[in-house]
Amino acid sequence: MVGISWQIVLAVIGVVAGFIITDKILNMKGYRGREILRPMELEELCSHLMTKYLVSVAAIAGDKKIVEGVDDYEIDEIRTLMRSMGSEEILLVSGSDYRYAMRGNGIFIYIKGKFVSLEDFAKVWKLVKSSIAGVGV
């Protein structure tokens, strides 16, 4: 009976160790779809949004201006709309087309793209908010 109980304990330890090792390997290989929720520089944030979410991005911070896939007319239009409404954030939705802009602390970000649902857009919103929290001008 004592021999069987040790076998059970070793089997449980082996299964737990297998799960832990598999989890570490999946994380190292990048098969986990975890989001990056850390402060990023504007260039890094824009390139990450463009490659992962396939959106057009414009970011302006002081004299630094990053524009990819957005023309100046759209940026002026959304900034004028935000100024006239007196808001810090705006989200315009038309079907699957989403246009989001936010400003604060001397930073302006405009994102334009297609999302399947508001839940998918919420991932981008959370990423932008957490990234901008640590970005300075």
Curated annotation (Swiss-Prot):
Domain of life: Archaea
Chief location: membrane
Entry membrane topology: Single-pass membrane protein
Keyword Transmembrane helix belongs to the record: yes
Keywords: Membrane, Transmembrane, Transmembrane helix
Membrane-crossing residue ranges in chain numbering: 4-21
Cellular compartments per GO CC: membrane
Cellular localisation: Membrane
Protein name: Uncharacterized protein AF_0541
Organism: Archaeoglobus fulgidus (strain ATCC 49558 / DSM 4304 / JCM 9628 / NBRC 100126 / VC-16)
Upper lineage: Archaea, Methanobacteriati, Methanobacteriota, Archaeoglobi, Archaeoglobales
